[in-house]
Amino acid sequence: MKASQFLFATLKETPSDADIASSQLMVRAGLIRKIASGLYIWLPMGLRVLQKVERIVREEMQNIGAQEVLMPMTQPAELWQMTGRFNDYGPELLRFKDRHDRDFVLGPTHEEVITNLAQGELRSYKQLPITFFQIQNKFRDEIRPRFGVMRAREFTMKDAYSFHVDQASLAKTYDDMYDAYTRIFTRLGLDFRAVQADTGSIGGFASHEFHVLADSGEDDIAFSDSSEYAANVELAESVCTAERQPATMARENVDTVNMPTCEAVAEYLNVELATTVKTLIVQGHTPEGEPQLIAVVLRGDHTLNTIKAEKIEEANVPLTMATEEELKAAGLHKGYIGVELDMPVFVDRAAAALSDFVSGANEVNKHTIGMNWERDANITRIVDIRNVNQGDPSPDGKGTLQIKRGIEVGHIFQLGNKYSQAMNCTVSGDDGKPVTLMMGCYGIGVSRIIAAAIEQNNDENGIMWPLTPNISDSLAPFEVAIVPMKSKEETVMQTATALYDELKALGVNVLLDDRNERPGVKFADLELIGIPHRIVVSDRNLAEDKYEYINRRDTEKQLLSRDEVLAKVSSK
């Protein structure tokens, strides 16, 4: 491609509404333009990158036998009503009526549509397993779109769906998809982790997320420094290796006036925060379903994990704290609640290992020191209800946990029969009887990958695209840029053009920057866009039969022969 025939839409100034590095650089480098909140145009430079991601994703989906389809973005509401998600999904689902007053939605995902397709096309167990995928735009009416294409309202996604007659078949395809995702993100040169995750609004019973590690990520992920263990902090298991020691103190109430927090009490009593406990009262129910309050107890230095706490059978979902009126009726005072309670008491593992600890005294402005389980208070059940912390033991017994921010770029689910049962999607089994299909769904944020890659790879001059194992998988819109310096002699342009033609013939994605701009402008643009290899052709260097070569990642100038240049740009 010749730059004089290509839209270079670079900007010197950083857009005022671009809030993270990737959104700033994608606009400045001329990859995208914003037309409304959460809505973007992909310019020619950016579309080249998007299409590269799509190609790699498509190749790996086809490698595991997935068949490509294309479903409409507009979906009839009755499909969503069959599964109950028309009302349950929330305001992110854009609902509208056509001119005939029929209800439709703009698809944020396609479980209902693909299940409807399977219901109409699949007849026998002999057709299974089967996997369909598409690469298509989705729409979610985000309340606050931000971070550029990272959290846009309209975005490009690869979504795949598999159908099976049994769980064993689903598990096999799930593993194949997991491996395919690993290959995709490895080919793209991303530093990523696959983590155990919650199934969320999609539903199902097994789930993994794929996260690109970046400080700007919205999710906290925990992973071992010595093994492959990784999990979303929401699900990472907390391990307590400490054993409860015998009591050495008598219990005693002490005055803690205007000290409703563990931090204030620990400082006042000159004790470690980890020797205090906090008691939270939440709404729950008896085994018979009658309303009751329950208590959850954690160490003072730990944070309640809502998702884990919701797994307590007696807790209401979503987890809801007791109201002021409910606390008052129970004779309790927020900030001073103890562990001796006339209700079920669920204690986190770490808190259950404490002895001689400090708790509330169930009396305003008082706490109790020297508290011990069994002697002074009973535990209904020991549970895992806290977030893990940096340095905690890894649950697999190998190493310690590291916690970093991650950008979710992929998510896979074993859905089971949630959608197929709701939509009566069955096939004839080997005994002739109808079998409700098992399903898996597998998503990749194609446009989000680009933002995540930039978050992980940038410097003060612009984008530095990830180093990929194969140059053909590079995300850069062009792998090589040739810059002919202005000269009175035609030799410079002729040589640059000949090199350009030769690289094209070798299959290298090359740009000839023949724009009528100063060299400094060209160099700045190429660094901003992140072209990995830059070759400068000039009178002075041609006199020595040399070319100036610069790699985007080290910017050190090298004078190389033609053969050396070709070796540089075709092997990395």
Curated annotation (Swiss-Prot):
Keywords: Aminoacyl-tRNA synthetase, ATP-binding, Cytoplasm, Ligase, Nucleotide-binding, Protein biosynthesis. It is found in: Cytoplasm. It is an enzyme of class 6 (ligase). Its EC number is 6.1.1.15. It catalyses: tRNA(Pro) + L-proline + ATP = L-prolyl-tRNA(Pro) + AMP + diphosphate. Belongs to the class-II aminoacyl-tRNA synthetase family. ProS type 1 subfamily. This is Proline--tRNA ligase. It comes from Psychrobacter arcticus (strain DSM 17307 / VKM B-2377 / 273-4). The gene is proS.
